[in-house]
Amino acid sequence: MTLPSNNSTSPVFEFFLICFPSFQSWQHWLSLPLSLLFLLAMGANATLLITIYLEASLHQPLYYLLSLLSLLDIVLCLTVIPKVLAIFWFDLRSISFPACFLQVFIMNSFLTMESCTFMIMAYDRYVAICKPLQYSSIITDQFVARAAIFVVARNGLLTMPIPILSSRLRYCAGHIIKNCICTNVSVSKLSCDDITLNQSYQFVIGWTLLGSDLILIVLSYFFILKTVLRIKGEGDMAKALGTCGSHFILILFFTTVLLVLVITNLARKRIPPDVPILLNILHHLIPPALNPIVYGVRTKEIKQGIQNLLRRL
């Protein structure tokens, strides 16, 4: 495909995505592991959703939260990965103006929704381990419903201005985005307007939301750890530490990659441009692939539910 020049001053109706500028010839090979991860993420999350829906014994607050996390993972994967694979396989690099900013909105809002869901799940584990006698009265179906509304409303409303601000910019610096996906940073760099407000709002809101969630997650697991260390039975202690430890490591991976992405964007002149592009893609693949395994499949009730589901097929 012949790409337009980035010196064009004509109105922009579509953008062109350039994946891995330095490794164009490797894209077909890279598509193979990405496709496998995509299929794993979609299959694992879909299986978890179907299992929880069909198994009456799993109609409990914890599993409703797992369903919410799986739904967010599926939407994030479908927003990003099919377009990336279409570029790799069919050289379909163009993306319309509205589709690009819809992608910006979904990525910003759903990533912060996922962070907020992690925080609520950490609170759920805190109540279960630190206040077990009060669990059934605190973590109710009504609590989960209110939490889900909070997750969607807080993050959807606060991240909505990011694509709105970007879509109102004048794009006279070209059409070519040096990325596989429409991120706010890569798109707004093409504008000939001042993007200070745009970039500042995303930075402040993004890290306020993610930072507050992370602080509450760390506090929850700190109190969980204190309680677990008081458990007398070594087997029970090891089981609790193993479960909570794997949860916390997954959350740490989620936030660490976001932090690395921010650092690479700030120091982009010193870092190869393909590094943040790859991190962006992996961040939309690895957590969705691991979440149902770490949070769901390792749970005895989920395993039993999947076995029951397979018997019905």
Swiss-Prot record:
Location in the cell: Cell membrane
Keyword Cell membrane in record: yes
GO molecular function: G protein-coupled receptor activity; olfactory receptor activity
Disulfide bonds: 100-182
Keyword Glycoprotein: yes
Major subcellular site: membrane
UniProt KW keywords: Cell membrane, Disulfide bond, G-protein coupled receptor, Glycoprotein, Membrane, Olfaction, Receptor, Sensory transduction, Transducer, Transmembrane, Transmembrane helix
Residue ranges, Cytoplasmic side: 55-67, 122-146, 225-246, 298-313
Glycosylation sites: 6-7, 184, 198
Extracellular side: 1-33, 89-100, 168-203, 268-276
Topology within the bilayer: Multi-pass membrane protein
Origin superkingdom: Eukaryota
InterPro entries xref list: GPCR_Rhodpsn, GPCR_Rhodpsn_7TM, Olfact_rcpt, OR51/52/56-like
GO CC field: plasma membrane
UniProt similarity note: Belongs to the G-protein coupled receptor 1 family.
PANTHER family named in the record: OLFACTORY RECEPTOR 56A5, OLFACTORY RECEPTOR 56B1-RELATED
Physiological role: Odorant receptor.
Protein name: Olfactory receptor 56A5
Underlying gene: OR56A5
